[in-house]
Amino acid sequence: MSAFVSKYEDELIKTAKYIATPGRGILAADESTETIGKRFAGINVENTESNRQAYRELLFTSPGSYPCLSGVILFEETLYQKTSDGKPFVDLLMENGVIPGIKVDKGLVDLAGTNGETTTQGLDSLGARCQQYYEAGARFAKWRAFFKIGATEPSVLSIQEDARVLARYAIICQENGLVPIVEPEVLTGGSHDIKKCAAVTETVLAAVFKALNYHHVLLEGTLLKPNMVTPGSDSPKVAPELIAEYTVTALRRTVPPAIPGIVFLSGIQREEQATLNLNAMNKLDVLKPWTLTFSFGGALQQSAIKAWAGKPENVAKAQAKFLTRCKANKDATLGKYTGWASGDSAAFENLVVIGYRY
């Protein structure tokens, strides 16, 4: 089917293409107040607005990080915050060639008729909110759906419902000038092997792109944020080269070349692990018609937040840690990462957040 023709069509295509610039990626700094609170608890920092502002300012003002980043995903609170000297975060990012984006979903609700599966809420007010976010300076958005692997999961109902919701979100964003990042995440929890994850990922992605087509979404003005294909978290680990092979194969079977970029989520992967996997994908010698880059949260921030520990005197040290991960992932998007950033023990720390619920 033909894509919807929006008055923003040219801008959407230009923005999506820019975000997918080879050698650059996205910092996902859109943790909810509850989630950032759990990360702060791990470093004994109180979860206040001023501390959240200080931490985001640390990230956004890190010297040398801008050439590694094409976009930053913000939480709604952060979209309207300013630096300590009064400059809006949005202006700071744009002046340095980094496009601001915004998380627009409203979290998960249980999907009735399933075995504990979920769907994502927030469509009712989305159009009006997108207009407000565009006026505030955001130029792309993110919406996540979760798919768990179990004996009978993900169910057909879950796949079809979340694919429909992702497509509705995407077209509403495009009608209001925001590039949609479509994020169908197959969760890593479980003891399944990599082949099972690959099969589920392919099924989910096929359903998502079918729904995007039905809803006339402009693929050239859309970005995909999928999981990497890995074994379950309770299964034996495998080499980055195998993860790369299964992930790229799943994408080649399901993702149209009209999509300009695939920006991987890192999930609960350790910093170094996520970087090595991304690097292996970009080194893989097969046709990949899209840019393969990163949209990492914890896998860009773990070393930095630990070094910061809420203390102003640690800001420069934390920024140096953040820059190290930015440069490592920049190299990985080009298939040129050599492991030079693996010396920090925090790069290998478990990123599971106990009690986490999106």
Curated annotation (Swiss-Prot):
Major location category of this protein: cytoplasm
Molecular function, one GO term: fructose-bisphosphate aldolase activity
Catalysed transformations (reactions): beta-D-fructose 1,6-bisphosphate = D-glyceraldehyde 3-phosphate + dihydroxyacetone phosphate
NCBIfam families: FrucBisAld_I
Pathway: Carbohydrate degradation; glycolysis; D-glyceraldehyde 3-phosphate and glycerone phosphate from D-glucose: step 4/4
Post-translational modification: S-glutathionylated at Cys-68 and Cys-173. S-nitrosylated at Cys-173.
Site for Necessary for preference for fructose 1,6-bisphosphate over fructose 1-phosphate, residues: 358
Catalytic residue positions: 183 (proton acceptor), 225 (schiff-base intermediate with dihydroxyacetone-p)
Protein name, as recorded: Fructose-bisphosphate aldolase 7, cytosolic
Tissue specificity note: Highly expressed in flowers, and at lower levels in rosettes leaves and cauline leaves.
Enzyme class, spelled out: lyase
CC per GO annotation: cytosol
Family (UniProt): Belongs to the class I fructose-bisphosphate aldolase family.
Subunit structure: Homotetramer.
Gene that this sequence comes from: FBA7
Superkingdom to which the source organism belongs: Eukaryota
